[in-house]
């Protein structure tokens, strides 16, 4: 099954991303949430990452393709249990944790274009506070517009 490209608009930045087939239940759930609008805030325990806290939300997801040390551009969903449910958006070095200790979360989405702006987004949220974020399925026009805007910046 081919998954759609996801456009992420976060603050003034845009990214194209690819869903990870090795987390099929997480991907399926995420697609039902789109378009998903929320606020990104800076993590408290994990390092260079942003998160969307979801409190006691229970998606009834298993751990799949989970990691505690995601790479920049990887987006994870922690399904809850030990700590609160959350999305984690990594822009640099991350060791995923909470006040309860180390955690692992489902890696289901990866930024594939625009990654050079990840650090700028992270630092913007760190110094200025919460920013709007929108995850949506990108149609061909949105992808073309994204790429033309990137090319114009060069």
Regions found by a protein language model. Name each.
Residues 1-22:
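N-terminal intrinsically disordered, low-complexity, charge/repeat-rich segments that act as generic
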Residues 21-154:
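Glycine-rich active-site loops that engage anionic ligands at enzyme catalytic sites
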